[in-house]
Structures are given as C-alpha cells and as structure tokens.
C-alpha cells in the first residue's frame, strides 16, 4: 500500500473494457417516467440560414465521386442508365449510399427536400428508397468522425445540427404508431448520441420524448435508451458539470478543454431526481429483467447521476451492493459472486467523488477494486482521468511537493509493471503530469517520465507537433535544473540520448548553453563578491592588528 500525507491531505493508494437490447419491448420491464419539460434543459440553438450553396455543393461532390461510381463493377443491364448520368434523385441517393459517401447523400437529400417539401414522403411511399437503406445511411452518417466540422467545411452557410435534425424529422415519417422496432430504437439512439455530443440537448430531449411517447410514456427495457435517459434527465453527463478548478480558482465545465467539436451545454441540470433510485434497485436485483440488460455505460450513468446530485452515501451503498467494495474496511465483501466492473465504471466513481471534493474516498474505493479484482482491466481513459483529476483538485498550499500526482504515477507504474506492460504514451496524461512537475520544479521525476514513456513516442515515424512540444517542455525543465546545479556532461548525455532528431537536439543544446552560461555568470559574480568580502575582512583584520600594536 502506498500512502502519502501532506498538510490536511491524506491519501491511500494501492496496486491498483453499450449494448442494444433487441427484446426491448418487455412490458413487465418498462419503467414509468415522470413527465418533464425538456425545454428547461436547452442548449444553444443554431439559426436555420438559407442554403444557397447546397446546389453547388451537390454538383461538386457529384463530379468528384462520379468517376468512382461509373467505374464500379455493375451488371451490363444497368450500364446504359449509369453511363447517361443519374436518372433520378433517388438513384443519386442510392449511388451515394453504395459508395458510402454519406455527406453527399445528406446534401442531396436536403436539397431535394427544400425544393419539394413532400420529397421524403414520396420517396418512401414509392419505395424509391427502402427503410433499411435509409437506416444504413443514418448509421453511416452519424458514425462519421467530426461530422459537424466536415459539414461546416462542405457547407459553411448551413447549420450541421439543423440538417441532422431535419433528417430526424424526415425519419419520423417512416414511424407508425405504437412501440418502435429494434432498428428504429437503435437509430433514434444514434440521433440522441449525436445531439448530446453536439451539445444540442433540447434536440436530444425531443428524440427521447418521441421514444417515450411511442411506449406510453414508459422507458423501454433497452440499455442505450436508459443510458440516454439518465444522461439527459438525471445528470449523467459529466462533460457538462461545473466543477471548481483549484488551479484556476474558479468553476469550469469538465468538457471545456476538449476539442472544439465536443461541445458542452451551459444550461445543464437534472430534471428527474427519482428514476435513478429505481435504476439502483433494478440493476442490483438478479431477479429483475434490467439486471440482465445492464451494460458498462448504463452502470456508469447511474454512478454519474448519483455524483451529480451529490448523493455520495447512496453512491457508496450502490458500490457496495454491486461490487462488494466499501469505504469501511470491515464492510468489505469477499463473496466471489460479484462481477468485475469495467474501467468505465471506475472512471465514473472517480469523477463522482472528485467533483464533490472527496478524491481521497475515490482513491480508497479504487484501491479496494484493485485488491478485490486482480484481473481488472484499466484502459488509458482511466489513467488519463486519474491524472486530470489529480491536477484539477491539487493545491500548492496543501500539497506543495505534488505528492498526489506522484502517488498516482507510482500506482500506474506498478500496475503496468505487475502485468509486464509498458506505460501508456498518452500525451494528455503526460501533460497533466507536467503541470505538477513544472510548478514544483521536480526535474528528477521529469527524468523518470522521459525514460519510461518517451521511448514509445520515438518509435513512431513522426512525432506530432503536440507531442514534440510536450517533450520539449519536459526536456527544458530537466536541462534548466541541471544547468543551475552546475552539471555539464550529464545534460549533454541526456540531449544526445533523447533528442528524436537533429533539429530538436540543436534546440535543446542551445537552451542548455543559455542556462549554463547564466549559471557560470552567476557563479562568477558570487566568486567575485566573496573575494571582495574576503578582501574587506582581511583589510579590517590588518587595521585591527596595527591599532593593537599602537596600544
């Protein structure tokens, strides 16, 4: 067990991977949901600007992909039709779908819908495009990385979220009254996930309301839907939480420093404080249908909801009932019937406690998880969150030597060493570690980071700009301290051994020489000052001796 104490901070550290339910419509498992006004949880709304560039965009993308479509292997029966161009908009859509050009599909569909408001309905009524094909398009489109960024680059004058919401409204025309089919439920959850990631929580609430209304205001027994309900109604979206940052001295959104296409909502709050208690009971009861529907995402959402509401006592009870881990040593359960949690659950536990200014309890529980479940797999996201929280809650006043971050590093190192694994070369994690090392001026631990992690970085063909800049930060911290301590051969050896290229080697050498010269000049000034002081002392001694003789 690793223990560190600094001021009032007492830490205990030790050796420390969403499913869709097809049978979602089980009436005995559906949950009655309290009615809430989703408009209270509104996110910023884009204006629906006129899309004068749609026609041009479709034409450009059509020309770009036409050659690929034409040269595809197709039966001779259709060669004349294809060679003469697209005979109809629906043929265009099918071509885009088959070539997996989902962006062009969306642009063309939007253009046709604006020219003819009934285009979507006619398309499905005439069976020009099947529901399965349309679902495949939605699956492909909403799986595109940075979709909003790519839409804004293709159509700079059009709101990407409004285009996707119009797509959802078109999809509604295919839905008949009654419970949704498993495919429809899956597609609706894809829409919700997209709107959540785009910080369009009002639109996500609208889709969720449609799911609930189709099921008589009951929650279908489906893991993904339940997860989204907890995220939208019960506070299980930590990216939108507002938490105090000790380093900044003010509260910030947890997701505020993520990439600019992972947006956060500034009006996030919990609308339902009761359903999470129901989920706690159902997920802990082996006789419940929900017990067999639970997933890592759903379990994490319950933990996040309790953390957002500040219900740490209920959270401790939930952890104890589901995994046999307690903050009280005598309450630990050794029953082998418990199943090891996922890394995602531990991230939720850590975030829930740390956001309530109780990271020591989070670390104690994590210590218990690692002791009870030796086969527990902790992915890079867990270690990243651990260091992000250790930096966010760290205060130089209570922990001037950065023992919290150092303890987390030691635990991570020992966990990987016990499994004969290399430490993760994660730039985000290393940047969090550097923040503490630089502010505590700890160059020795910085050397350890470079020696244990950067060999993985240098195995890559090319370092990214961010990785190169981060390495320079570590190297400069080390070289500056070595220079100030009077080292010469040791820093030169470090530069030669760890510089990934000649350019960086030259930069680091010049940086070291600069601080080495400053050290030499400072040493020279001190020597001269000492010599002058000694001379004054000698002169005073000589004068004293002369005066003594006179007496």
From Swiss-Prot:
Pfam families the record matches: ATP13
Region (Disordered): 530-551
Domain of life: Eukaryota
Gene: AEP2
Claim: Mitochondrion is one of the keywords in the record: yes
Family: Belongs to the AEP2 family.
Main location: mitochondrion
InterPro entries: ATPase_expression_mit
Localisation per UniProt entry: Mitochondrion
GO MF annotation terms: RNA binding
Record's protein name: ATPase expression protein 2, mitochondrial
Record text on subunit structure and interactions: Binds to the 5'UTR of the OLI1 mRNA.
Keyword Protein biosynthesis among UniProt keywords: no
């Amino acid at each position: 067990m690793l223990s560190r104490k600094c001021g009032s901070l007492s830490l205990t550290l030790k050796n420390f991977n969403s499913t869709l339910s097809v049978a979602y419509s089980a009436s005995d498992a559906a949950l009655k949901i309290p009615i809430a006004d989703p408009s209270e949880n509104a996110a910023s709304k884009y204006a629906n600007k006129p899309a004068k560039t749609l026609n041009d965009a479709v034409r450009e993308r059509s020309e770009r992909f036409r050659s690929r479509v034409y040269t595809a292997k197709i039966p001779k029966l259709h060669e004349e039709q294809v060679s003469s161009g697209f005979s109809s908009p629906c043929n265009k859509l099918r071509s885009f779908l088959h070539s997996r050009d989902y962006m062009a599909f969306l642009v063309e569909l939007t253009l046709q819908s604006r020219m003819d408001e009934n285009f979507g309905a006619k398309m499905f009524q005439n069976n020009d495009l099947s529901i399965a094909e349309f679902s495949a398009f939605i699956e492909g489109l909403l799986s595109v990385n940075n979709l909003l960024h790519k839409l804004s680059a293709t159509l700079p004058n059009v709101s990407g979220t409004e285009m996707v919401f119009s797509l959802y409204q078109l999809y509604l025309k295919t839905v008949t009254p009654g419970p949704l089919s498993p495919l429809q439920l899956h597609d609706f959850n894809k829409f919700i996930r997209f709107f959540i990631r785009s910080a369009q929580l009002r639109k996500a609430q609208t889709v969720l309301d449609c799911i609930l209304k189709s099921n008589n205001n009951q929650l279908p027994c489906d893991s993904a839907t339940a997860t989204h309900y907890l995220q939208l109604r019960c506070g299980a979206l930590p990216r939108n939480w507002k938490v105090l940052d000790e380093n900044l001295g003010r509260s910030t959104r947890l997701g505020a420093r993520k990439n600019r296409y992972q947006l956060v909502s500034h009006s996030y709050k919990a609308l339902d404080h009761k359903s999470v208690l129901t989920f706690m009971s159902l997920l802990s009861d082996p006789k419940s249908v929900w017990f067999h529907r639970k997933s890592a995402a759903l379990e994490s959402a319950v933990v996040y909801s309790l953390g957002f509401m500040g219900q740490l006592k209920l959270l401790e009870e939930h952890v104890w009932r589901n995994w046999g881990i307690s903050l009280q040593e005598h309450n630990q359960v050794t029953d082998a019937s418990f199943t090891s949690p996922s890394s995602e659950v531990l991230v939720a536990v850590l975030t829930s406690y740390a956001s309530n200014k109780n990271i020591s309890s989070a670390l104690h529980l994590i210590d218990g998880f690692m002791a009870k479940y030796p086969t527990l797999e902790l992915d890079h996201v867990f270690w990243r969150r651990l260091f992000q929280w250790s930096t966010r809650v760290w205060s130089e006043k209570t922990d001037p030597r950065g023992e919290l971050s150092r303890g987390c590093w030691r635990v991570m190192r020992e966990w990987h060493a016990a499994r004969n694994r290399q430490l993760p070369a994660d730039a985000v994690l290393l940047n969090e570690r550097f923040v503490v090392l630089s502010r505590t001026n700890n160059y020795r631990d910085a050397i350890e980071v470079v020696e244990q992690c950067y060999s993985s970085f240098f195995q890559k063909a090319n370092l990214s700009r961010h990785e190169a800049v981060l390495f320079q930060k570590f190297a400069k911290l080390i070289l500056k301290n070595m220079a100030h301590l009077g080292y010469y051969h040791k820093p030169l050896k470090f530069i030669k051994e760890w510089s990934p290229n000649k350019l960086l080697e030259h930069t680091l050498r010049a940086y070291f020489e600069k601080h080495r010269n400053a050290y030499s000049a400072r040493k020279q000034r001190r020597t001269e000052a000492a010599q002058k002081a000694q001379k004054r002392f000698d002169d005073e001694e000589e004068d004293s001796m002369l005066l003594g003789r006179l007496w």
